[in-house]
């Protein structure tokens, strides 16, 4: 794939819709530690960077794009972090709605779930150890 400084290098780049792009970017950078990479207009879009190569685009509301309605879950973003407990504390400090406290799972991850003020669901995950998928009932189909 060719490089383009205008587009994040990640293969999959989710675009999440928020009613106020600037307000959402301010909250996501403060609460979840994202870094604003590119701003497109004052209220149109922003690209946010997270970790090593991860990216998300925050877009504005238009006639064919709306944020989730209260109580409606259409997706969940999974973000890998170095220290899930520290990340959890930061998210709580900035008013994230905690849906699930940090929990260790048999597949080697420690995770917590949160919602931002606009209803988007986020899961943050720290790798504790490398675990063979067969150990917890998974089947490895490709070695990437």
Model regions and ranges:
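Vicinal oxygen chelate
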Residues: 1-15, 25-115, 125-144
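Short, surface-exposed ligand-recognition loops at beta-strand->loop->(often short) alpha-helix junctions
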Residues: 16-20
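C-terminal catalytic core of tyrosine-transesterase DNA break-rejoin enzymes
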Residues: 118
């Amino acid at each position: 794939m060719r490089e383009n400084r205008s587009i994040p290098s990640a293969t999959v780049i989710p675009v999440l819709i928020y009613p106020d792009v600037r307000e959402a970017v301010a909250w996501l950078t403060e609460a979840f530690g994202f870094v604003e990479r590119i701003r497109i207009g004052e209220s149109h879009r922003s690209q946010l960077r997270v970790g090593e190569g991860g990216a998300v685009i925050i877009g504005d509301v238009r006639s064919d794009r709306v944020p989730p309605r209260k109580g409606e879950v259409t997706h969940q973003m999974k973000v890998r972090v170095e220290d899930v407990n520290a990340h959890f504390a930061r998210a709580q400090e900035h008013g994230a709605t905690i849906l699930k406290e940090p929990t260790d799972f048999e597949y080697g991850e420690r995770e917590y779930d949160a919602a931002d003020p606009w209803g988007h669901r986020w899961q943050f995950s720290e790798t504790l150890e490398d675990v063979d998928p067969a150990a917890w009932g998974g089947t490895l189909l490709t070695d990437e």
